[in-house]
Amino acid sequence: MQHIAQPTNHLSLITTLLITNHLSLHHMARKNNSSDKDQELNELIADYEAAKKENKPLYLDGDQLADIADRYALSRRFDEAQEVINYGLELHPGHTDLMVEQAYLYLDTMQLQKAKNVAECITENYETEVKLLKAEILLNEGNLDEAEKLLDSIEDKESLNTILDVSYLYMDMGYPEKALPWLTLGIEEYKEEEDFLAAMADCYRSGDHDEQAIYIYNKLIDKNPYNASYWTGLAKSHFNRQEFEKTIEACDFALAADENFGEAHLMKAHSFFHLENESKAIQEYQLALKGQSIPPEFAHMFIGLAYTHLENWELGYQNYERALKFIGDEESPILTDIYSNEAYCLSKMGRYEEAHQICERAKEKTPESAELYLQEGYIYLEEKEIDKAKESWEVAIRCAPEAETLIRIGNYYLNYNMLENARMCLEEAKRLEPEHPSIDIRLASLCLIQQDYKGFEKYNQLLDPPLNLRDVQEAMALDCVDGAMRKKIDQFIQEIDEFKNEDSDEDEDEDEDENEYPDEKEND
């Protein structure tokens, strides 16, 4: 995650989309139940829960119990899902559907090795659902080639369910380009089927082909205007294009169709966050959490970020603490960010000792994380412990010797008006990654602050388009009632003009010398 306000982490577009696209549980891609089947399953669950409450025996087939467990897992009721699977395997030892469901439950709870162990015990390896499960495990291990071979061995590969299952598997695992060939298998036969069109739209969106995705989502909405998932898919495509107002509008239509459609609340929340309406973002994140469309640790992290942007440090800290409680002792991709933000909030409340304790606790869990050392250094800088800040940042650079790390440190120095230190960091970042998209603008701006006209010209000419100093001049004049800053900028622009004139005179002198030199040669 990047930073917009020092040094609070925020939802960059890329991070937001990655998280949003991968929050869906594996079950969502596997089950494409019709409304009739959904109704049957709802009745089955009601019977099961009534029998359980009254402690009455109820015999159910293995596939029925697997469906109940799947629904519970989809609702993130993991303990209840496990209870159903345990009960089912007592009644039906080794039942394939229940074993598959057990493996997926382990995947959903990030227990890859346990999922692999269960999958190895399944004997019916020829079954499509078993191949899908084992392919997902291979993809989780990074074995794309092996997964492709296994999926290619599926016999009924041109059936609609197989095409959808394989396509969504590739999409969910971050390989939308691998989904497209499978979808092309069904274009002629299924091109009017809503489920097929929805998969095509989702595939285009996952592959950043949002214009095509929007076209298909609109086609689906024409067919079925009260389908909340189509409106939400459209919203995600607009979000990809940073069209946040359109995202919110599409989400409103989704919620008009289904007021409990939590994913629409999630996309609204992300959009309000990027529109800097943090209060509304918090409301929508809470509704998304209520609708179980987002894991609670993610929800509280996002809510914490919103409160941090509002500079409500206490509520930000409290939500990061809640997120950590939900994670517990498990591994999580957001653990470092939560610790980092929690430490930042504590430092803003003047609780520096606690902030450093958080950093130390975090380093025990993720010792190679540059983010923690960057944050720790910033806290030391707030305490005016410059040497300790530098020590932390040296470790951060060793952990991540990249331009982005140096840019972050440069920004921290800038925040405390330590301009020479900032410039050294940014120039080293420029050396490491000359084509980094944000270094030249940062260096040009820093030279502007330092009134270094030669440096400014050097970096400004690398920008496309270059900074327009007259615009800067007018903007500064509007911001400075007493005119002091305007006078400073006017003087700086005059110096730049003089510098350009000097360069121009030097160029003319060089041209004259070049013209005279051949004549002298001829006279010889």
Where are these regions (language model features)?
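Canonical positions in the second alpha-helix
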Residues: G88, C121-I122, S153-I154, L185-G186, ...
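TPR/TPR-like (Sel1-like) alpha-helical repeat modules
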Residues: E124-T128, D156-E158, L324-K325, R398, ...
